[in-house]
Amino acid sequence: MEENMNLKYLLLFVYFVQVLNCCYGHGDPLSYELDRGPKCPFNSDTVSIIIETRENRNRDLYTLQTLQNHPEFKKKTITRPVVFITHGFTSSASETNFINLAKALVDKDNYMVISIDWQTAACTNEAAGLKYLYYPTAARNTRLVGQYIATITQKLVKHYKISMANIRLIGHSLGAHASGFAGKKVQELKLGKYSEIIGLDPARPSFDSNHCSERLCETDAEYVQIIHTSNYLGTEKTLGTVDFYMNNGKNQPGCGRFFSEVCSHSRAVIYMAECIKHECCLIGIPKSKSSQPISSCTKQECVCVGLNAKKYPSRGSFYVPVESTAPFCNNKGKII
């Protein structure tokens, strides 16, 4: 399983090198069409919704039309907080990292977790090897995925009386930008802003040179938290209210030499799950003071990565030291 993941991301990385160097040098990356055939199609029938609560962990598949069959959606109101999880290119909501992230959320704070499985539009089901040629299509599909998330959000707010303050989005790679487009759409619908969007190593190719309106942006939610773990598959640019650069945003400890970039890119999801599961937080030190020891951090200047980040007053870019194994924090995770 791990070898297949490594091979997938290696092929993706090789392709990105070619695309970035040859294809995306000029013009709007989102308008570039490498493939004009019906590959990686997006429509409401190609997206599955997986809903998890403490009472129901079956991970059954739903659509917009069948949501009302889930026990939670049979209620007149939904009172628990909601988290959307959105995967990235050639991935799915059924990959181990995303299952673990959903489980951590449900176990921690009794969230209702809604995982958006857009694997068809993310090119996951295309022919092996060739699927990586269709990345531009998947990148364009992120806007449609965002609109889909916004449609579910509208249902939650209008029919189930959930406050936008109780809805958070978490997206990895292309899923981070899809979350950003959802944030833009709900504002267009006059629903307000999501309480938070967490971008887990947002994808760099097709988005790095884009204006705020064409990618995940700080204005897409009340609070936008970005976790940077790679500098080629993921962007190095500051995008959020807070930007955490784990191990300086590249070459994550424990990822080895040969698959460092691809392993580092996926490590963002693992870090978030560990931050939720364990009290030991990964501590962000202001980049301007990155040489100072963690032991000297105060709650006024340093920030814990994860669900509690927005409780800290500091904003901006942060360096986060990490260890090579879970739970990855290199001390007891306390800020004085």
UniProtKB/Swiss-Prot annotation:
Swiss-Prot/TrEMBL keywords: Allergen, Disulfide bond, Hydrolase, Lipid degradation, Lipid metabolism, Secreted, Signal
Taxonomy, superkingdom: Eukaryota
GO process terms (BP): lipid catabolic process
Subcellular location(s) per record: Secreted
UniProt KW Ion transport keyword: no
Enzyme class: hydrolase
Enzyme Commission code: 3.1.1.32
Known tissue expression: Expressed by the venom gland.
Residues making up the signal peptide according to the UniProt record: 1-27
Catalyzed reactions per annotation: a 1,2-diacyl-sn-glycero-3-phosphocholine + H2O = a 2-acyl-sn-glycero-3-phosphocholine + a fatty acid + H(+)
Enzyme active site: 173 (nucleophile), 201 (charge relay system), 265 (charge relay system)
GO function terms (MF aspect): phospholipase A1 activity; phospholipase A2 activity
Xref: InterPro entries: AB_hydrolase_fold (IPR029058), Allerg_PlipaseA1 (IPR002334), Lipase (IPR013818), Lipase_N (IPR033906), TAG_lipase (IPR000734)
Prosegment location in residue numbers: 28-36
Cellular component annotations (GO), alphabetically ordered: extracellular space
Principal subcellular localization: secreted
UniProt keyword annotation of Lipid metabolism present: yes
Disulfide-bonded cysteines: 40-123, 212-217, 255-263, 280-304, 281-329, 297-302
Family: Belongs to the AB hydrolase superfamily. Lipase family.
Protein purpose: Catalyzes the hydrolysis of phosphatidylcholine with phospholipase A1 activity. Induces hemolytic activity. Acts as an allergen.
Protein name (database record): Phospholipase A1
Source organism (scientific name): Vespula vulgaris (Yellow jacket)
